[in-house]
Curated annotation (Swiss-Prot):
Gene that this polypeptide is encoded by: zapA
Classification of source organism: Bacteria, Bacillati, Bacillota, Bacilli, Bacillales
Keyword Cytoplasm carried by entry: yes
UniProt protein name: Cell division protein ZapA
A Pfam family matched in the record: ZapA
Cellular-component GO terms for this entry: cell division site; cell septum; cytosol; plasma membrane
Length: 86
């Protein structure tokens, strides 16, 4: 089995620089970092008194919540598709 080369980049999230390492494309990793940064900034608008650690946790909680809702919706759609196929 051929070992895939890991990509390494530096990204900025909410004013801090982080090193990211992964098998995904650099573009994908930059997109992930950009979405996290955007979500943290959005959370800050509604919760300006939170420090960056609490803001990061709130962002993570909201992101996992959204992910679970999407998984539930996917399961519903898969069930509907099964019924339609008979």
């Amino acid at each position: 089995m051929e070992k895939q080369e890991k990509n390494k980049i530096s990204v900025e999230i909410y004013g801090h620089t982080y090193k990211m390492v992964g098998l995904e494309s650099i573009g994908h990793m930059r997109l992930v970092a950009s979405i996290v940064d955007d979500r943290m900034r959005e959370m800050n608008v509604h919760n300006p008194s939170l420090d960056s650690t609490k803001l990061a946790v709130l962002t993570a909680v909201n992101t996992v919540h959204d992910n679970l809702l999407l998984k539930e919706r996917l399961e519903q759609l898969e069930e509907e598709l099964k019924k339609l196929k008979g």
